[in-house]
């Protein structure tokens, strides 16, 4: 079982975060994380401009302990108190329910939704459509501790070009098997966005 801590940052200079991703990864991996990615929201309604630092852990406690150790590092404290440092404005904990491919830098399109988790057959259909359209990885997450969004789910589609995401969405949302699965699970999208992944 894997969990993701998602810390949201707001500020005028995302380069402070982007330029220090190697250090952040060094520190969280030293505490047992499989790594950290930064999602710079570029088209996400009211979330546009936010950066979300997502770190991946084997347990919730390990995640919190690992992040606490990172925040206590003098190098991180120096970054956090610098004049242009973004401010942490929120944090979510999610549980990984489905995965396909290996996520990495590039782009991501995400959809938050209400409804049950997809079954094996439904996920296989989604991954086949994604693969045909150049999607490099998929993660489906259960938003466990996410304020008013708790109990929803999020599907994240990683890609090398935003065109991959757009083409995949066009096929997926008109696919009869996907539509049938959406009816079975009670799928209702509540938010959608695009991000640069660092």
Model-identified regions with their sequence ranges:
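Short S/T/G/P-rich N-terminal loop/turn motif that feeds into the first structured element of a domain
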Residues: 1-198
């Amino acid at each position: 079982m894997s969990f993701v801590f998602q810390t949201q940052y707001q500020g005028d200079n995302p380069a402070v975060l982007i330029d220090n991703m190697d250090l952040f990864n060094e520190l969280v991996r030293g505490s047992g994380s499989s790594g950290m990615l930064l999602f710079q929201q570029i088209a996400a309604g009211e979330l546009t401009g936010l950066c979300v630092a997502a770190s991946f852990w084997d347990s919730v406690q390990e995640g919190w302990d690992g992040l606490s150790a990172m925040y206590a590092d003098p190098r991180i404290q120096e970054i956090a108190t610098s004049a242009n440092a973004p401010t942490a404005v929120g944090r979510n904990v999610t549980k990984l329910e489905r995965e396909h491919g290996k996520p990495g830098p590039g782009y991501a399109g995400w959809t938050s939704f209400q409804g049950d988790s997809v079954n094996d057959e439904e996920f296989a259909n989604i991954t086949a459509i994604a693969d045909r359209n150049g999607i490099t990885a998929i993660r489906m997450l259960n938003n466990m501790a996410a304020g008013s969004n708790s109990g929803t789910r999020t599907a994240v589609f990683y890609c090398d070009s935003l065109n991959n995401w757009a083409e995949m969405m066009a096929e997926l949302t008109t696919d009869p098997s996907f539509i049938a699965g959406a009816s079975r699970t009670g799928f209702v999208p509540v938010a959608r966005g695009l991000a640069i992944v660092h």
